[in-house]
Amino acid sequence: MHKKSACEREGKELKRDFFNKFNLGTSNFVTPGKQLEYVSECKPDSTAVICLDKEQNCSVITWHQLHVYSSQLAWYLIENEIGPGSIVLTMFPNSIEHIIAVFAIWKAGACYMPMSYKAAESEIREACDTIHPNAAFAECKIPGLKFCLSADEIYEAMEGRSKEMPSDRLANPNMISLSGGTSGKMKFIRQNLPCGLDDETIRSWSLMSGMGFEQRQLLVGPLFHGAPHSAAFNGLFMGNTLVLTRNLCPGNILNMIKKYKIEFIQMVPTLMNRLAKLEGVGKEDFASLKALCHTGGVCSPWLKQIWIDLLGPEKIYEMYSMTECIGLTCIRGDEWVKHPGSIGRPVGDSKVSIRDENGKEVAPFEIGEIYMTAPASYLVTEYINWEPLEVKEGGFRSVGDIGYVDEQGYLYFSDRRSDMLVSGGENVFATEVETALLRYKDILDAVVVGIPDEDLGRRLHAVIETGKEIPAEELKTFLRKYLTPYKIPKTFEFVRSIRRGDNGKADRKRILEDCIARGG
């Protein structure tokens, strides 16, 4: 029996020739503003976003409210000459106000530039000097802009303005992303595509991520980072109820999944590991989940197998890409069990080539630098303050990741070239050592760095987050099950928590500096 959509239940007729079930128009391509209007027409009083702050105070906004508020704020932007060609810096935490602001920016046809609300003053100054934003949404005051509105002030800006959406505008470029990279200097990356989705893109996203229409979705990453941003706004585009929380401790996330009967979640492997190691966690805790999509780092085979056992292989999705959008692979759990350790095959007409230091393609199973070409429909990006990536013959580019392919073209990730350590003349991938350490039941997180050493060049040093100190010999004995001897750290250091960014990635440079300062 056909299950009626929200629009059909409310008496609105949908065009059945569109995959986009909310598309009430005639064009296959729909902007975020127009899609928000369509969804709000279909289910105006349904909940669009639920937000819980660190004290668990709950705020809710309906689809009708989200559409009206973002339209009113868009009119404020337009009246202040913010539109196509303008850049709006946005520094709110994950919040309803952040969501309203982004839709308003796109409705005005402007470019959205997210940045951490915890950014240092020097970083904000660097961003402004490089990008020259026209306006900002932030709790701090940024001089030299047309305006800088706080979360409270955006509601004041809405007052007295039209509730109707401005004429549909294409935001192109639609977004400027930040990548810290390994250089220590921020890279600003512009997405040069009109903001919106067509049926092919929505269908591809759904197949790659496991996301469906009108699901309950939990966001556990920052909106200023690529993967959580895509998951959040693609989810809203598909009519999902988006649940935001500022309390990202594993126990709270588990409670949120159960309380809100979450159906879709995107996570980084670090969080997957912390959730899996919660005492008493079991299948019943994730009974509502229909899909878990993981990105943003290496998920070790043993950890992935734990989640396959918890959810079932057909509910686990993995995507591999990067802020520069040079290519894309994906794999689902039931395919992964036949190719354990793989991060998938190229999507669509994307291609992968593994090359040596001279740029020559290597044979299957031989480790080299990962070069990729992007699908024709993929995001077109460019560095604003950095030299463009070198383009090899055939359009192949690389961001410095290391890996190999098997004979069937499945890609396997080893590490970032910058994270490869040379110790005693041997190449050691930090990720491989960290993966082995995390198998130990009491270790919650681990980062391996190379301490300068007169004898070895770099001495392997493991920084470990755990609730108790573990004897070094016990750890070395454990690691011998999984690593050849030269890959086992010479020294270990135990800390209460490991420094990671909001995107879940370890700040290796800072961790190494701290270790050296402490005499590691």
Curated annotation (Swiss-Prot):
Optimum temperature is 50 degrees Celsius. The keyword Repeat does not apply. GO terms for molecular function: ATP binding; cholate-CoA ligase activity. It is an enzyme of class 6 (ligase). Inhibited by diphosphate. The keyword Zinc does not apply. Its cofactor is Mg(2+). Functions in the bile acid 7alpha-dehydroxylation pathway, which forms secondary bile acids via the 7alpha-dehydroxylation of primary bile acids, and is carried out by intestinal anaerobic bacteria. Catalyzes the initial step in this pathway, i.e. the ATP-dependent thioesterification of primary bile acids with coenzyme A. Produces AMP and pyrophosphate in addition to the bile acid-CoA thioester. This is Bile acid--coenzyme A ligase. It comes from Clostridium scindens (strain JCM 10418 / VPI 12708).
